[in-house]
């Protein structure tokens, strides 16, 4: 059953070829057998999953099934789950059990999905390799000596290893798209405000966005249909009708205008990846698309601007973790200052501390104008670059990452090298645009992803563009060795 896509599993359940309980038991057994070598899960929830599966079977028997009824999924451990630990990959929240469900979790529960557990991630979603997790690194199923990407590395690895047909992720600067590329799956970051952030532990509030991760664009469309929509509890969530994403998958691509930014194909990009991206674009030409070169002149400023804005917001958001109300608390503090200092010092890892330090510095008196204000001005310039580009083209394509998955430790000693792993994805977050990554081939036995970027609220178009490519190719069907059995 693990060979089937989410859409195929839903069809099988509807035809009563198997029950949700059988499907859930099969995936739980697979997690128990394979995940010790991958470490993609922080917490598994077999009792909850089987109870949800039994309830789903009852709904299926009554003919009350929805598109996700009885389908196993897993949640990134950044989403609050009532009665289940929500750690955010940090020692700070190692013992935190949320009293409520995040909006995304509520919506999957209401749709009848089955939650298998909570997935590993970089601490507080800060990282590009899943090496910053308090619970240890996640291994890439294609080569366990390499990283799965981050911060949604557990989600990407679990889907790639067929431990779960679909998983949630979050994307602040590439944290859905980059791990999707490294693990050879499909991942979508929606437009900022398309999916509620209520109950999603905040990293950078003006950048964070939740999205689906699965094997195919069709599966992502099914998941996004559940996730998207207005939520009055999130002031940044947009009150806008949600289209039928799956219905849009049948549209042809004749006359689709594709833009290739020249800035995406310069120094630093692995030539093998560039070749695979151009080969994928050639496939789109055969499908009727028109391709032209475009320019995003301020792209080179996206990484430095991001690493002012995101740490500044992180510094503010993580101030709430003080050892008083919840989270890690040091033993025997001598006074309040000691409680704060030791609790935060013990609870946060090195990368989180680095970003808090950067952000606090950027917001401090005398430096605010020089750093934070300037970064926000650059952010506007980047948004304007995209606006002008989308007057000429319908979608933008390019590499998701400059390299394939790298080995553990290869970049951990050099933060700048690590940050540059997201050089092609960060600008999309700064502008609040939707973007996705789809697999387009392999280099040195490791998957390569292509990024597709669209205008605001064009997720239906992106999903269709990705789906048509996946109808014409089979890269998304490839499975890591030792995982297919």
Swiss-Prot record:
Enzyme active site: 76, 151, 175
GO terms (BP aspect): translation
One annotated GO molecular function: ATP binding
Pfam (any one): Amidase
Disulfide bond positions: none
Keywords associated with the record: ATP-binding, Ligase, Nucleotide-binding, Protein biosynthesis
Superkingdom classification of source: Bacteria
Major enzyme class: ligase
Family: Belongs to the amidase family. GatA subfamily.
Function recorded in the entry: Allows the formation of correctly charged Gln-tRNA(Gln) through the transamidation of misacylated Glu-tRNA(Gln) in organisms which lack glutaminyl-tRNA synthetase. The reaction takes place in the presence of glutamine and ATP through an activated gamma-phospho-Glu-tRNA(Gln).
Protein name: Glutamyl-tRNA(Gln) amidotransferase subunit A
């Amino acid at each position: 059953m693990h060979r089937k896509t989410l859409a195929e599993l839903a069809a099988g359940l509807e035809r009563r070829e198997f029950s949700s309980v059988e499907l859930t038991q099969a995936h739980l057994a697979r997690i128990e057998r394979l995940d010790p070598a991958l470490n993609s899960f922080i917490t598994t929830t077999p009792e909850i999953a089987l109870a949800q599966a039994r309830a789903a079977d009852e709904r299926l028997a009554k003919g009350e099934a929805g598109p996700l009824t009885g389908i196993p999924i897993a949640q990134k451990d950044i989403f609050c789950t009532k009665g289940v630990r929500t750690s955010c990959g940090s020692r700070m929240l190692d013992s935190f059990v949320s009293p409520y469900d995040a909006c995304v979790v509520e919506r999957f529960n209401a749709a009848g999905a089955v939650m298998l557990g909570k997935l590993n991630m970089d601490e507080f979603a800060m990282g590009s390799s899943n090496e910053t997790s308090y619970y240890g690194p996640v291994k890439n199923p294609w080569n366990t000596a390499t990283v799965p990407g981050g911060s949604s590395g557990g989600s990407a690895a679990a889907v790639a290893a067929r431990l779960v047909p679909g998983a949630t992720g979050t994307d602040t600067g590439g944290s859905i798209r980059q791990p999707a590329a490294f693990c050879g799956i499909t991942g979508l970051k929606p437009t900022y405000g398309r999916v509620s952030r209520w109950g999603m532990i905040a990293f950078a509030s003006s950048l964070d966005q939740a999205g689906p991760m699965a094997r195919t664009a069709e599966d992502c469309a099914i998941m996004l249909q559940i996730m998207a929509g207005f939520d009055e509890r999130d002031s940044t969530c947009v009150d806008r009708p949600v289209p039928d994403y799956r219905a849009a998958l049948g549209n042809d691509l004749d006359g689709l205008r594709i833009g290739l930014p020249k800035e995406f194909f310069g120094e630093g990009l692995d030539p093998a990846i560039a070749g695979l991206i151009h080969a994928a674009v050639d496939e789109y030409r055969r499908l009727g698309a028109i391709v032209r070169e475009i320019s995003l002149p301020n792209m080179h400023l996206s990484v430095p601007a991001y690493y002012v804005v995101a740490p500044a917001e992180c510094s503010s958001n993580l101030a709430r973790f003080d050892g008083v109300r919840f989270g890690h608390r040091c033993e025997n503090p001598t006074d309040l200052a000691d409680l704060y200092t030791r609790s935060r010092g013990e609870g946060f890892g090195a990368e989180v501390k680095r970003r808090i330090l950067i952000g606090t510095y950027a917001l401090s008196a005398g430096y605010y104008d020089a750093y934070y204000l300037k970064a926000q001005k650059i952010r506007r310039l980047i948004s304007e670059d995209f606006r002008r580009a989308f007057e000429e083209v319908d979608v933008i394509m390019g590499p998701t990452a400059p390299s394939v998955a790298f080995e553990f430790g290869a970049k951990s000693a050099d933060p700048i090298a690590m940050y540059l792993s997201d050089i092609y994805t960060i600008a999309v977050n700064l502008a609040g645009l939707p973007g996705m990554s789809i697999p387009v081939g392999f280099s040195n036995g490791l998957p390569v992803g292509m990024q597709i970027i669209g205008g605001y609220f064009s997720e239906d178009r992106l999903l269709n563009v990705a789906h048509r490519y996946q109808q014409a190719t089979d890269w998304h069907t490839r499975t890591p060795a030792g995982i297919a059995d």
